[in-house]
Amino acid sequence: MSRMAEQQLYIHGGCTSATSGRTFETINPANGNVLATVQAAGREDVDRAVKSAQQGQKIWAAMTAMERSRILRRAVDILRERNDELAKLETLDTGKAYSETSTVDIVTGADVLEYYAGLIPALEGSQIPLRETSFVYTRHEPLGVVAGIGAWNYPIQIALWKSAPALAAGNAMIFKPSEVTPLTALKLAEIYSEAGLPDGVFNVLPGVGAETGQYLTEHPGIAKVSFTGGVASGKKVMANSAASSLKEVTMELGGKSPLIVFDDADLDLAADIAMMANFFSSGQVCTNGTRVFIPTKCKAAFEQKILARVERIRAGDVFDPQTNFGPLVSFPHRDNVLRYIAKGKEEGARVLCGGDVLKGDSFDNGAWVAPTVFTDCSDDMTIVREEIFGPVMSILTYESEDEVIRRANDTDYGLAAGIVTADLNRAHRVIHQLEAGICWINTWGESPAEMPVGGYKHSGIGRENGVMTLQSYTQVKSIQVEMAKFQSIF
């Protein structure tokens, strides 16, 4: 593919040049080619976007619930019509296999938008009787202008997960995509405008997180920030948001999630789940079950089943329908994952497979890392303690239920957890003791629109998706009505 035209900001219904004068490049990680030069938003651009959003939000909030719902449904239709086109762009920008982006990324994002478009008329207040002559009623009112800051692994899906409930509740959103994968968020802005969204209600500001992101989190005109990314960055976003104007925050941060296989489990099922929990999207999923706990007596058989399934991984041309494994998102990220792999070897974990870059003409110019499985791991190893965000599985053994629950919870993270067992009593008993916000029994990874997702501990604050997220983009106003004559003590 030839190099794309220089990408601008999207403010008030159209593309516009950044006043900062700064640019950055976005790279195709499959081959190292530059896809496009992208303009970076500066402080003045953030000010422009906020003013635009404030104007648009008033128009948007004044529409009826059904009017807003129809516009968002039109956007859903356009997204589905252009699924393949958007998936191709997402594959170029992220390196993910087209077999994945064409069936997951846009599809699941559009599902969430459709879900919230349908919920808009159901955003109701309540009426609370006090006595015969008095009652209270409540209203869910929009926050105003909110900011979304996305991660690089699911660019358009995250943009939709954040914008759908925000817009459904009557807010305007300024979205900053990751500078690593900024392209599809700009296309989403065009789609929203085409669907009839008033100018300014969804603005997109590409830029570097330490600059553009910081300007957004500090801006007094922003009422809430929804952030997806790493823990360290999340802490900075939260601190800036609180220090500037006590903004509300939603944080979807990192994870080091446990997958517990019990001795009564079907090991074929367990191996299938472990593969999806570690190598889907080349391991670049925040909920990955990278700590795989297996009973000691089942370890050898389980390892053989994993090795057999690794042979089914097909890396190569990301547009080949048979490819199910792509490069990592960038060369700096590849190098970081390789440092973790080297650390695992240094600390005594045994490499069952992988452990290096993929080699060959198809891979030499890209950010490719081989699917890697470590075994004979211990809880104190760096690869077991820290989030790697790559195709690296760690296998650990255990002896008892109480032991594995304790060890599974022995982490600062609490995003996800899963168990594989034939005993449903055990399944519920154990899941209720795991310190994680998203849990799966005999499955892994699905996050439908109806399901609230978010973490415990350092893995985040608040939730995305589900009814409660729509409500979190509103502020509740309570109004008391008195029908009798008011009595003053003065």
From Swiss-Prot:
Cofactor annotation remark: Binds 2 potassium ions per subunit.
Cofactor: K(+)
Associated pathway: Amine and polyamine biosynthesis; betaine biosynthesis via choline pathway; betaine from betaine aldehyde: step 1/1
Residues annotated as binding NAD(+): 150-152, 176-179, 230-233, 254, 286, 387
One GO BP: glycine betaine biosynthetic process from choline
Enzymatic class: oxidoreductase
Pfam families: Aldedh
Coiled-coil portions: none
Seems to be a necessary countercharge to the potassium cations (site feature) positions: 248
InterPro entries tied to this protein: Ald_DH/histidinol_DH, Ald_DH_C, Ald_DH_CS_CYS, Ald_DH_CS_GLU, Ald_DH_N, Aldehyde_DH_dom, BADH
Modified residues (Cysteine sulfenic acid (-SOH)): 286
UniProt keywords, alphabetically: Metal-binding, NAD, NADP, Oxidation, Oxidoreductase, Potassium
Positions bound to K(+) 2: 246, 457, 460
Active site: 162 (charge relay system), 252 (proton acceptor), 286 (nucleophile), 464 (charge relay system)
Catalyzed reactions per annotation: betaine aldehyde + NAD(+) + H2O = glycine betaine + NADH + 2 H(+)
Binding site for K(+) 1: 26-27, 93, 180
Family affiliation: Belongs to the aldehyde dehydrogenase family.
Subunit-structure text: Dimer of dimers.
NCBIfam families the UniProt entry points to: BADH (TIGR01804), PRK13252.1 (NF009725)
Functional description taken from the UniProt entry: Involved in the biosynthesis of the osmoprotectant glycine betaine. Catalyzes the irreversible oxidation of betaine aldehyde to the corresponding acid.
Protein name in the entry: Betaine aldehyde dehydrogenase
Species for this entry: Escherichia coli O7:K1 (strain IAI39 / ExPEC)
Gene name of the record: betB
